[in-house]
A protein has these predicted regions:
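An N-terminal structural lobe/cap that precedes and organizes the functional/catalytic core
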Residues: 1-52
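Short, well-structured active-site flanking segments
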Residues: 17-25, 72-75, 146-150
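Acidic catalytic motifs of isoprenoid enzymes
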Residues: 41-131, 142-147
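Conserved small/polar residues in nucleotide/adenosyl-binding loops
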Residues: 165-174
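Active-site glycine-rich loop that binds ribose-phosphate moieties when present
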Residues: 152-162
Length: 177
């Protein structure tokens, strides 16, 4: 049986292969496909460097495992702050990227210390894929705990709301899980 570790490693490898060509248009990639690790392109980082997607996935996984399998969104937000401010969960102690919505939400959490689920951004333009990228640990969590669809939607909404409170982010995350 494939373990959750295999999925996380596969996620990190895929992310590291995509980082150099992030924001590259499809036509250019069709002419010059990525078939191995490369570096020093879009984000000007060495090959094998992963992005915020993997870092936040690792932070999510760390939060769940250190909380004995519980979901504690404030702890998760604290781990995200460690990543954002200290470079934890990165290959070299430096963050590669952070989207504006996540930056604003974590800034609000740090400043107010309100419940993390009340710090996510609510605008119609704050519905990117940022929370979707950290759902793999939630897939494992939901599977291991035999969660039904209504509980998955509630769980995903809470976790997404640390940065993204828009309904689209919640529904797409729940659909993935």
């Amino acid at each position: 049986m494939i373990s959750s570790k295999d999925g996380i490693i596969g996620f990190a490898i895929g992310d590291a292969m995509g980082v150099p060509v992030e924001f590259t248009n499809r036509e250019k990639l069709m002419r010059n496909p990525i078939t191995s690790m490369v570096g020093f392109m879009g984000h000007n980082v060495p090959k094998g460097t992963w992005s915020d997607d993997t870092s936040m996935t690792l932070a999510t996984m760390d939060s769940i495992t250190k909380a004995n399998g519980n979901i504690i969104t404030n702890d998760m937000a604290d781990k995200f702050l460690e990543w954002m401010e200290q470079g934890k969960y990165t290959p070299d102690g430096k963050i590669v990227d952070i989207d504006r919505t996540t930056l604003r939400a974590l800034g609000k959490y740090k400043t107010t210390r309100r419940s993390a689920v009340n710090c996510g951004c609510t605008s119609n333009t704050d519905n990117g894929n940022g929370s979707l990228m950290r759902m793999l640990p939630i897939v494992y969590y939901s599977y291991l705990n035999w969660l039904e669809q209504d509980k998955i939607l509630k769980l995903v909404a809470g976790i997404s709301s640390v940065s993204y409170t828009h309904l689209r982010a919640h529904e797409t995350g729940a659909y993935l899980v």
